[in-house]
From Swiss-Prot:
It is found in: Cytoplasm. HAMAP family: PNPase (MF_01595). One of its GO terms (biological process) is RNA processing. It comes from the Bacteria. This is Polyribonucleotide nucleotidyltransferase.
Length: 757
């Protein structure tokens, strides 16, 4: 790796990813050509056809009144990147797609903790997708580009950060896999990290992981592939580190040549040391007692009361610095919570480090829903609701991603009352979209195939109460609701949120000497406070046999691999416990709700699709109106027929089969037909859709001569007829059948006994 000046002021660094027999991928970072007025700008290329621009800018002055770091990450998908015109009414890009929002989150999560504490200048990172090979994904390239442009901008940033997707394909972890290669993968994960100096030399500190089993994982495992167990996932994290190191090195080399000098940005610490010492002196004892209260509401009420007392006692001393007092009180709370966990292995609600809160699960809680369930873990309460519909109700996706439709849609709602607060209610925020996507990824690997279950599925997770990991609660509630709706899942899935607390603890040896020891404590089923005050948020979902989804964010500069492996093992123990509780509520698919549509799949020849639809949809619309069934036809000839009752669906199927899969009537067959046309020489009678026969005028009079057909029959009349002859051209001659001579085999024209099966 080296940096080349490809023209004056334009520099390029290259990273080569060697995947052995799976080939190589080349990532190039170029700066100096585009977006020259941004603080830092990088054009990133993946091989030759993938190109995106990342630009980082900073405001000139800080937002002193902010008590948070104002970092904004935006991903702009340009449809010209794929040679397409947007499908919206105005034919231009509008609100960001779900893929773009999820990529924003992937970038934000490792970038945010890498800035200096107390920074209050607005920082904006804008990533624009300029060109995309349809066989590649842009999200991981965007992480690297955002890191590189930020590294060049002269900001107080402790990068660079490398991001890589690794997929387990044929037993090998492949970096930057193509969409085609991912179809053969059992597991893939996006891993971001940075280079650090470890005790044993240079290392890579993992900062963020977003991982999932693929949709066909069970079929691949049945075919002999390695299941993504906890051990395999831990190996994948280690396999990602060399690739991250290569990417970080390329970014750093580019920064060494082209980065602006780091500017002196003012920082605003949350509180001064004097404020902290004062708060600690007046609050430590009482706050320690308050943090042993088990119930969240009672504990919060007592800590709020203590905080008000501290503010009142220190009001005169620190007049005008009330925000600092509040921040110091929070910092003291964090210290006491962590201290108790590390020294006593007890948590603020009295549990041990591996204890799970009280669990409850029930199904069929919403009367008219197709499937519903209520899952509760402690004070976290999730209502899962499943809706089934025709496949044509699948989501249509207009984005740069490889998906164009989505049959399974998981929507997560987090109303403000779930935490006892007030707030805005409306369109989902990025957090809600991210949580819904995580729960969706956890469940996709166990969903039945379209052939086995021809439905579009919408799963909604309502977070009714929140105190730690509503996303993993959503996985559990969704599994229950899907089974209640009659969805034949391949295996039930449960999720659990883990946490990690670490610090240097003073320990005393046998000879009385004291030393500092780095201690890591992994927590099972973390509370909201433990999430906020801990060093790692680690969510794992899976079946009893393997992991289906994983999300990790850490604030540490490295977690020992044995600690991570232990956390995965601890998470599996918890997952198995939760699965047992869920199985007590429901352990196999229920009968489908009477309110859910019954969808039947049939196939018609592709060349018959036009006949089934008819001119301007005339035939299919008539079938829909007359039978009450909903019909959806795919390009390959698959027809989905849905109705809330069996007879309606069967009537529609019979009508479609009569057109597309007709069985020719035979001489001697009898029908109850409808007169559709009269002429001077006879009456045409409809036997089957698209199949008429003629009763000659000489046969209408029952042996008597008649002058005019209309004297005997009119259009719309029902006639019992028998096929007397079928000529070489397929024309059918009919004769009337006497009522008293009609045999039991007489069949309505819509469903002749010998013409359907």
């Amino acid at each position: 790796m080296s940096v080349a000046e490809i023209e004056e002021g334009v520099f390029e660094a290259t990273a080569t990813i060697d995947n052995g027999s799976f080939g190589t991928r080349t990532i190039r970072f170029e700066t100096g050509r585009l977006a020259q007025q941004a603080a830092g700008a990088v054009v990133a290329y993946l091989d030759d056809e993938n190109m995106l621009l990342s630009a980082t800018t900073a405001s000139k002055s800080p937002k002193e009144h902010f008590d948070f770091f104002p970092l904004t990450v935006d991903v702009e998908e340009r449809m010209y990147a794929a040679g397409r015109i947007p499908g919206s009414f105005f034919r231009r890009e509008g609100r960001p797609s779900t893929d773009a929002i999820l990529t924003c989150r992937l970038i934000d999560r490792p970038l945010r903790p890498s800035f200096v504490d107390g920074l209050r200048n607005e920082i904006q990172v804008v990533v624009t997708i300029l060109s995309l090979d349809p066989n590649d994904l842009y999200d991981v390239l965007a992480i690297n580009a955002a890191s590189a442009s930020t590294q060049l901008g002269g900001l107080p940033f402790s990068g660079p950060i490398g991001g890589v997707r690794v997929a387990l394909i044929d037993g090998t972890w492949v970096a930057f896999p193509t969409v085609e290669q991912l179809e053969r993968a059992v597991f893939d994960m996006v891993v971001a990290g940075r280079k650090v100096d470890g005790a044993d030399g240079p290392d890579v500190a993992i900062m963020m992981v977003e991982a999932e089993a693929t949709s066909n994982v069970i079929e691949l495992i049945d075919g002999g592939a390695q299941a993504p167990t906890e051990t395999v996932v831990a190996q994948g994290l280690e396999a990602a580190k060399p690739f991250i190191e290569v990417l970080c090195t390329a970014q750093q080399e580019l920064a060494d040549k082209a980065a602006r000098p780091t500017s002196d940005y003012p920082t605003f610490p949350d509180y001064g040391d004097d404020v902290y010492y004062s708060v600690a002196s007046v609050a430590t004892d009482e706050l320690s007692k308050a943090l042993t209260i088990g119930g969240k509401a009672e504990r919060d009420a007592r800590t709020d009361e203590l905080k008000a007392e501290v503010l009142a006692r220190l009001a005169e001393t620190y007049e005008g610095r009330e925000k600092e007092v509040s921040a110091a009180f929070r910092s003291l709370t964090k210290k006491l919570v962590r201290q108790r966990i590390l020294t006593d292995h007890f948590r603020i609600d009295g549990r041990g480090i591996t204890d799970i809160r009280a669990l409850s699960a029930e199904v069929a809680v919403v009367p008219r829903a197709h499937g519903s369930a209520l899952f509760q873990r402690g004070e976290t309460q999730i209502l899962g609701v499943t809706t089934l519909d025709m496949v044509k109700m699948a989501q249509q996706i207009d984005s740069l991603g490889p998906e164009t439709t989505k049959r399974y849609m998981h929507h997560y709602n987090f109303p403000p009352f779930s935490t006892g607060e007030t707030g805005r209610v409306g369109s989902p925020k990025r957090r809600e979209i991210g949580h819904g996507a995580l729960a969706e990824r956890a469940l996709v690997p166990v969903l039945p195939s379209l052939e086995d279950f021809p439905y579009a599925i919408r799963q909604v997770s309502e977070a009714l109460g929140s105190n730690g990991s509503t996303s993993m609660g959503s996985v559990c509630a969704s599994t229950l609701a899907l089974l209640n709706a009659g969805v034949p899942l391949k295996a039930p899935v449960a999720g659990i949120a883990m946490g990690l607390v670490s610090d240097d603890i003073e320990v005393e040896a046998g000879d009385g000497t004291k030393s500092l020891e780095r201690r890591f404590v992994t927590l099972t089923d973390i509370l909201g406070a433990e999430d906020a005050f801990g060093d790692m948020d680690f969510k794992v979902a899976g079946t009893k046999d393997f992991v289906t989804a994983l999300q990790l964010d850490t604030k540490l500069d490295g977690i020992p691999s044995q600690v991570l492996a232990g956390a995965l093992s601890q998470a599996k123990d918890a997952r198995l416990t939760i699965l047992e509780v869920m199985a007590e509520a429901i352990d196999e698919p229920d009968e489908m709700s009477p309110y859910a549509p019954r969808v039947t799949t049939i196939r018609v020849p592709v060349d018959k699709i036009g006949e089934v639809i008819g001119p301007k949809g005339k035939i299919i619309n008539a079938i829909t109106e007359e039978t009450g069934a909903q019909i959806s036809i795919e390009d390959d000839g698959t027809v989905f027929v849905g109705a809330t009752d069996g007879p309606s669906a069967q009537a529609a199927i019979d009508r479609i089969n009569a057109i597309a899969n007709p069985q020719l009537p035979t001489v001697g067959e009898r029908f109850l037909g409808t007169v559709v046309k009269t002429t001077d020489f006879g009456a045409f009678v409809s036997l089957l859709p698209g199949r008429d026969g003629l009763v000659h005028i000489s046969k209408l009079g029952k042996g008597k001569r008649i002058a005019k057909v209309e004297d005997v029959v009119n259009v719309g009349d029902k006639l019992r007829v028998e096929i007397a002859d079928i000529d070489k051209r397929g024309k059918i001659s009919l004769v009337l059948v006497e009522e008293d001579n009609s045999a039991p085999a007489d069949t309505p024209a819509a469903a002749p006994a010998d013409a359907t099966s």
